[in-house]
Amino acid sequence: MNDNLKSSGIMLVISSPSGGGKTTISHLLIDELQNDLVRSVSVTTREPRDGEVNGKDYFFVTEHEFINLCNTDQMLEYAKVFGNYYGIPRKFVMDNITTGVSVLFSIDWQGAFKLIDIMREHVVSVFILPPSMEELRRRLYNRSGKSDIVKKRLGEAAFEIDHCYRYDYVIVNHDVEESVHQIKCIFTSERLRVQRRILLKQFIDNYIK
């Protein structure tokens, strides 16, 4: 890409029902777009687990520090889960996208909708569907082996899938490599949008002189 016509980063939001392939696809995207895409790092008040690194897995803070971040508008969104706070730090996201690096969010539809509502101009959202509900049933059964859990997960999946209409793109994950390829195409084209071209006016003014 011409150094005089760079693009800002995007907030790439990926969702799918459990067993839809979201996690695998996200890992592959990070591996293949490593110079242009980073995984979102959340802030949390929970204690670090063995092997977790501050600033890589999470930003670990006290509850007092977390509340202060919220009160000073430094969190894009946050929630309390099982007694611990989790949130998306505004500075981490904006520092990346303003320098041309995109941020990947592998989240459920509720988190996706929150980001769409507050950061619409930066968000590109993709919902991943399993090849079929029968295939999803097979995957879930292979994971748990318990029919009652599978039945519950399938019900949850149908509810989640019903929210796909608000996403920018919907992909049926017949093949992981093909799904990754499709999302990489989306990624490239979205970063080439006029509104994401940094210093475009200056570039054009010099171009037509």
Swiss-Prot record:
* Entry's localization field: Cytoplasm
GO cellular component terms listed in the entry, alphabetical order:
cytosol
List the catalytic activities from the record.
GMP + ATP = GDP + ADP
For this UniProt entry, the molecular function terms from Gene Ontology, in alphabetical order, are: ATP binding; guanylate kinase activity
Q: Which residues form the Guanylate kinase-like domain?
A: 9-188
EC number, as in UniProt: 2.7.4.8
Domain of life, per UniProt, equals Bacteria
Which family, according to UniProt? Belongs to the guanylate kinase family.
> What HAMAP family does the entry give?
Guanylate_kinase
Give the protein name, as stated in the record: Guanylate kinase
Tell me which species this is from: Ehrlichia canis (strain Jake)
